[in-house]
Amino acid sequence: MEFSTQTTASLHLIKTSALAVGVYADGVLSPAAEQIDHASNGAIRAVTKTEFRGRAGATLVLRNLAGISAQRVVLVGLGKQEEYSVRAHSGAEQAFAAYLVAAQLTEGVSTLAALPIENSTMRDRARAAAIAAGQATYHYDATFGKPDREALPKLKKITQIIERAEAAQTQQGLREGAAIANGMALTRTLGNLPGNICTPTYLGETARKLAREFKTLIKVEVLDRKQVEALGMGSFVSVARGSAEPLRFVVLRYNGKPATARRTRGAAGPVVLVGKGITFDAGGISIKPAATMDEMKYDMCGAASVLGTFRALAELAPALEVVGLIAACENLPSGTANKPGDVVTSMSGQTIEILNTDAEGRLVLCDALTYAERFKPSAVIDIATLTGACVVALGGVNTGLFSKDDALASALLEAGRQTQDPAWRMPLDDAYQEQLRSNFADIANIGGPQAGAVTAACFLSRFTQAYPWAHLDIAGTAWRGGKDKGATGRPVPLLMQYLLNQAA
């Protein structure tokens, strides 16, 4: 989809299929709505007195208004004026884009990004608008026998009305938002695909497709079981052993720096993103309940977010180095699967007692985190649907953020704030490490019923002593259940904004 900008002082002269103007709660009109209301002899105030009160996300369409060139004026509810934020703006833009899709329109014009918001820039609002439009236009039909929207016209263009002085800032924000939205779309589709299609091999092939599409920016290596065993990744291999699907260890390298500016001795290393890629998690011998087991196809959303971030990176081509690592396999019960009480040796040399085979994400991540050392990274961020305990603690609003590095944690929190993809910093005190004590190995893979999200992060921290590290537990934010079941594309916005901030 194309995003563009236009500067005009005469909104009533804009020729478009649909023009969006904002209305705050209790019928308070935005400046754009005031202008259209004046040009149409009070058409907007006539409806705000009765049927449209500006509830956040609500829309009302006024057609063929006298004195207005736009075919439709779409009133978009903004909520209370004193509470209007970038998050509310994102919701308003998404509501407008959703209307354009539902009405089968190919283009529209929005005045919403021009509304001032405290502690935000035009770039922030433009980025939010493009991400919101991408979310509204995303549609999954990969596994339907007949794509249900094949014949419908597609939304091709949204134009933002802005001040001339803000053109460069707006265009930059729209470009960033469009790339992030494309990365989120890839992440969502990978998450939504069933486990019999999106296998470890499929993830490897998706990485290779990215490398072919962006061959000057992305290089990919896909390792098989024999190569992984040669590296000593005994913990990762032990999880994969229970399934007939072959494991894959995917290494992506992005370098947007000019050849003359490539890394020299002593320069900062790359940022490394590590994604958990359990393409289906039945729990292994410690099998999960059947009722919601279908949702365990989403256990690879950490890996999907790495791939989505790399897509967005390649589209924007910022001048930095990023490595992506994906440890992909299935976790199934079988005669060759891990058993409770088994002891395995990780790539780091530390031995692990497996007390619960359904705590497998940390078993694949620990070897990937050890592998990350070879890149001498400036920071390592792992992304994983790791614990149900994090869902209990934070629900579906905030991603759980664990790190002992204050600077890294603050940078990630700020990136989440900038993109309305929030995270919440959780404790990582050494006192929790005692729960992971084992009588038969260096460490146990679970720490009992208390503080499950924290002890999972504590487990991972044992393998991250060589570099600054943060862990994102996305178990509550990577997908939604219920009637709107589906992957969300988070935390691609947070990750991309963090990387863009590093390149700035």
Swiss-Prot record:
Disulfide partners: none
Annotated localization: Cytoplasm
GO BP term (any one): proteolysis
Active-site residues, Swiss-Prot/TrEMBL: 288, 362
EC number of this enzyme: 3.4.11.1, 3.4.11.10
Binding, Mn(2+) 1: 281, 358, 360
Cofactor annotation: Mn(2+)
Enzyme class, first EC level, given as a word: hydrolase
MF terms in GO: manganese ion binding; metalloaminopeptidase activity
Signal sequence coordinates: none
Classification via Gene3D superfamilies: Leucine Aminopeptidase, subunit E, domain 1, Zn peptidases
Family: Belongs to the peptidase M17 family.
Its job: Presumably involved in the processing and regular turnover of intracellular proteins. Catalyzes the removal of unsubstituted N-terminal amino acids from various peptides.
HAMAP family cross-referenced by the UniProt entry: Cytosol_peptidase_M17
Protein name: Probable cytosol aminopeptidase
Organism: Bordetella avium (strain 197N)
